[in-house]
Amino acid sequence: MLSAALRLTAKRNVRSLATASSSSYPGALLNVPKTQVTRLPNGLTVATESNPALATATVGVWIDSGSRAETKANNGVAHFLEHISFKGTKQRTQSGLEIEIENMGGHLNAYTSREQTVYYAKLFSQDVAKGVNILGDILQNSTLDPGAIDRERAVILREAEEVDKQVEEVVFDHLHAAAFPENALGYTILGPKENIQTLSQADLQAYIKNNYTADRMVVVGAGNVDHAELCKLAETNFGKLPQGSGKAKFVRPAFTGSDVRIRVDDMPTAHIALAVEGASWTSADHWPLLVASAMIGSYDRAAGNAHPSSKLAQIVAKHNLANSFTSFNTTYSDTGLWGIYIQSNNRDNLDDLAHFTVREWMRLATAPSEGEVAIAKQQLKTSLLLALDGTTPVAEEIGRQMLAYGRRLSPFEIDRLVDAVTVEDVKRVANEFIYDRDLAIVAVGPVECLPDYNRIRSAMNLLRY
């Protein structure tokens, strides 16, 4: 429970924030440029947020397909394709493509996630037409040269080695595999080494045919980009894309309570992730779970925050239980993961760390306070708005939301959705998703003192603990 002083401070802060919200703050959100959306005859969607005052723009293609659209046999093909797409097209050699981008002063990039693949360019507004042409070319006309494919294997294998050195990446890959076994959502994005060594031109071509269709793509523009002009460019450069069979259909994965531990006693830091099943993008519980995650908050000893706002952060700081922790709410089209990622050098007190973490989770279901919820909502709204600083983050949000919701949620609408979350909403979702629910545990490093699965699981019910 918050101390009396903290409760008083919270109430004062909430009153002052409410006063600010009632005047200029909502008005500023309403002044954000409207997102314009057009669907072309072949099913391709074009979405833009135009700001003519800027000199730059981000244009990109968001594709409703990632590693979740793969099988065990071709796991890694989406990421492999992202690499090989930049190795030359029927019109442009690899060096010609690189020189063209360099001469514009632009940046061409791509990334693959579990449910989406993204190709985008950051450039001056006068080069938007060139950027869209390049994106259309690499997505539809890549040569997929067998020699380039073989050369790229070594690059991706080195990338996989680097990923394996990043413990956080390893933990979250294991977390997905443990929580969603025998489902493509549990696959890694890079795929196993065996697949990287054997994926062929035919595998890449089949993936393109099945997934790179107009109805699964959104062409996005943010910054100094004209919507009508981008629609014309999309029609010219993507108008011949086949329509496809509609949105990808996945089997909803069954969340599995599980425990994966990789004990390495000579590592200095224990890395631990605890997660329960979360909600999908479109679930009404998505926003209360985000607020609940913000209430658990984050902590970093190196940041030197003497007065952390979350109760768990206060406990961890007081007893030196962890170097850092971050609560997370990872969302997918039909499920999610809600949990916490912790790093700790205090290997002998991991039992206390697990105890206080789960205790705070249980408190969300039994006794969250008005002050805590109000502060968490303000922090969440701030973080969501600060994440939109620049044309590329705006483009990413537009693309992600168009694929997830079929529309863009404006900053004002998101602000209202967060604001509408009540203490009772937090208690309800905590009881539904967290209290007495199975959880997935992944721990890497010196984790001998972390309690076993059954002990942590029993603490998820206050009557049994």
From Swiss-Prot:
Domain of life (superkingdom): Eukaryota
Main location: mitochondrion
One Gene Ontology term of the molecular function aspect: metalloendopeptidase activity
InterPro entries the record matches: Metalloenz_LuxS/M16 (IPR011249), MPP/UQCRC_Complex (IPR050361), Pept_M16_N (IPR011765), Peptidase_M16_C (IPR007863)
Keywords assigned: Hydrolase, Metal-binding, Metalloprotease, Mitochondrion, Protease, Transit peptide, Zinc
Self-association and partners: Heterodimer of an alpha subunit and a beta subunit subunits, forming the mitochondrial processing protease (MPP) in which the alpha subunit is involved in substrate recognition and binding and the beta subunit is the catalytic subunit.
First-tier enzyme category under EC: hydrolase
Protein name per UniProt: Mitochondrial-processing peptidase subunit beta
Family: Belongs to the peptidase M16 family.
Function: Catalytic subunit of the essential mitochondrial processing protease (MPP), which cleaves the mitochondrial sequence off newly imported precursors proteins. Preferentially, cleaves after an arginine at position P2.
The UniProt record lists the keyword Protease: yes
Regulation: Binding to the alpha subunit is required for catalytic activity.
Location(s) in or outside the cell: Mitochondrion matrix
Cofactor note: Binds 1 zinc ion per subunit.
Active site, renumbered: 82 (proton acceptor)
Taxonomic classification: Eukaryota, Fungi, Fungi incertae sedis, Blastocladiomycota, Blastocladiomycetes
The enzyme's E.C. designation: 3.4.24.64
Keyword Transit peptide recorded: yes
Names of the cofactor(s): Zn(2+)
Pfam family, one: Peptidase_M16
UniProt binding sites for Zn(2+): 79, 83, 159
Cellular component, GO, one term: mitochondrial matrix
One GO-annotated biological process of the protein: protein processing involved in protein targeting to mitochondrion
Signal peptide as annotated in the record: none
Catalyzed chemical reaction(s): Release of N-terminal transit peptides from precursor proteins imported into the mitochondrion, typically with Arg in position P2
